[in-house]
Regions:
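Loop-centered beta-sheet repeat module
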Residues: 10-53, 58-62
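Short coil/turn segments that connect the beta-strands within blades of beta-propeller domains
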Residues: 27-29, 66-68, 125-127
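Structural signal for beta-propeller blades
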Residues: 38-41, 77-80, 136-138
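Short loop/turn segments that connect beta-strands within beta-propeller blades
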Residues: 43-47, 83-86, 142-145
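Blade-level signature of beta-propeller repeat domains, shared across WD40, Kelch, NHL, RCC1
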Residues: 133-172
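Repeated scaffold domains used in trafficking and secretory/extracellular systems
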Residues: 18-22, 57-67, 113-119, 156-169
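Conserved beta-strand positions in repeat-built beta-propeller and related beta-rich domains
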Residues: 25, 32-36, 71-76, 129-134
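Surface loop/turn motifs at the tips and blade-to-blade linkers of beta-strand repeat domains
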Residues: 10-16, 50-56, 92-97, 107-113, ...
Length: 172
């Protein structure tokens, strides 16, 4: 990559090649990824970009977690945690009977589809909230690799829960 100063002429082209969909800041720096980055990238305080780990194409919400990486593997319709030693967790994103879905088949691109994992926040180190289509929030347990509970707001296939955050900051 290249450094970009918005106060100067030039810079990157006005295109969305990487489809950045996650930015996270912690004590180690800034992490970001997108559908087409192929990696979870780390930005250091010296503005150097490095690869934290590789990622499959088409994932959302990738973030460092317990020395590994946690993300919505959107193409596989699962929440996936991969530890550095190769161990991890795979939990299916919930789906519903096709006949119960509203607006199914509205486009030929298959963008509006169920099981589309898009939204993730940590509740504890082992418990994760994810968003998915159609309009579903699920609470997942990485240790037992199962969905603990969830709520579906509508069966309109065109809608997916994107941004999630714990509030208050930590649950007791």
């Amino acid at each position: 990559g290249q450094r970009f100063d918005p106060g100067t002429k030039g810079g990157p082209p006005f295109v969305n090649n990487y489809h950045i969909n996650m930015v996270m800041v912690n004590d180690d720096g800034v992490y970001f990824s997108g559908l087409n980055t192929g990696a979870l990238l780390a930005l250091s305080s010296s503005m150097d970009v490095s690869e934290y780990c590789s990622l499959p194409r088409g994932c959302h919400n990738a973030r460092p977690h317990l020395g590994g990486v946690l993300f919505n593997d959107t193409r596989s319709d699962v929440l996936r945690y991969v530890a550095r030693d190769g161990q991890g967790a795979i939990i299916p994103v919930p789906t519903f009977p096709p006949e119960s879905l509203e607006y199914r088949g509205v486009d030929d691109s298959n963008i509006a589809r169920q099981g589309f994992g898009r939204g993730l926040c940590m509740i504890t180190d082992q418990v994760v909230a994810i968003g998915s289509s159609p309009s579903t929030i699920s609470i997942m347990d990485l240790e037992s690799q199962r969905r603990l509970t969830g709520v579906n707001l509508t069966l309109d296939i065109r809608n997916a829960i994107h941004g999630l955050e714990c509030w208050p900051e930590r649950w007791s």
